[in-house]
């Protein structure tokens, strides 16, 4: 049986970056759990902001820098920065640390694997045809410059009695080539028939290494 490696983990430090750029041997467990809680708070608060990734930095034990990568930064920043100020204050009160919150705009959400996966999940939950949604996502990604894309959905598709997996592939997807820039995202759609899992791989070209 073939063994699958996580596309991001396989390329960390080469074509992919870490989502947390700190190390603390003494408080590693505490910080790791806190990072996940910080991400959960932000994503739940701004579910409509198209957040792809939250990178967390810890310059010291008292300060946390959260870099939010979003397709709709205006929702997070708010009018005259009111929303982002409120978020910073909420995080500081909850975690008892000083926070710096930065927002980076995702220019092309059509080629961001996490956002594509979440968009497909959202459309499936609204009872759209999974085949139509997948084909449209592939068309949009290729139109925006993706070299290749694969979308996989698993579960009781269209209310079928037996769960199955279906996927579509367009273009190239060299998963075994370490210099390939592969973006990977996952999401879940909760339907009345059960959970449907979505996985998205997007090939963006090769890095010069």
Swiss-Prot record:
Provenance organism: Thermosipho africanus (strain TCF52B)
Gene Ontology molecular-function annotations: mRNA binding; rRNA binding; structural constituent of ribosome
Pfam family, one: KH_2
Domain KH type-2 span(s) in chain numbering: 38-107
GO CC, any one term: cytosolic small ribosomal subunit
Quaternary structure and partners: Part of the 30S ribosomal subunit. Forms a tight complex with proteins S10 and S14.
Keywords in alphabetical order: Ribonucleoprotein, Ribosomal protein, RNA-binding, rRNA-binding
A GO BP entry: translation
Protein name (Swiss-Prot/TrEMBL): Small ribosomal subunit protein uS3
Record-linked InterPro entries: KH_dom, KH_dom-like_a/b, KH_dom_type_2, KH_sf_prok-type, Ribosomal_S3_C_sf, Ribosomal_uS3_bac-typ, Ribosomal_uS3_C, Ribosomal_uS3_CS
Its job: Binds the lower part of the 30S subunit head. Binds mRNA in the 70S ribosome, positioning it for translation.
Family per record: Belongs to the universal ribosomal protein uS3 family.
Sequence intervals crossing the membrane: none
């Amino acid at each position: 049986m073939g063994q699958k490696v996580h596309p991001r983990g396989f390329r960390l430090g080469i074509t992919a970056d870490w989502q947390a750029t700190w190390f603390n041997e003494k408080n590693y467990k505490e910080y790791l759990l806190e990072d996940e809680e910080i991400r959960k708070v932000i994503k739940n608060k701004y579910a409509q902001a198209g957040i792809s990734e939250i990178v967390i930095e810890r310059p010291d034990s008292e300060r946390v820098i959260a870099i939010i990568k979003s397709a709709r930064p205006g929702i997070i920043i708010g009018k005259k920065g009111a929303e982002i100020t409120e978020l910073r204050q909420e995080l500081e009160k909850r975690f008892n640390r000083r926070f710096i919150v930065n927002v980076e705009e995702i220019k092309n959400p059509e080629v961001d694997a996490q956002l594509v996966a979440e968009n497909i999940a959202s459309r499936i939950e609204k009872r759209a045809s999974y085949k139509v949604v997948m084909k449209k996502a592939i068309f949009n990604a290729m139109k925006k410059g993706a070299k290749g894309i694969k979308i996989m959905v698993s579960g009781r598709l269209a209310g079928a009695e037996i769960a199955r997996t279906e996927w579509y592939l367009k273009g190239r997807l060299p998963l075994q080539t370490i210099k390939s820039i592969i973006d990977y995202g996952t999401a879940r759609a909760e339907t009345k028939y059960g959970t449907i899992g979505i996985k998205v791989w997007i090939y963006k070209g090769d890095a010069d290494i």
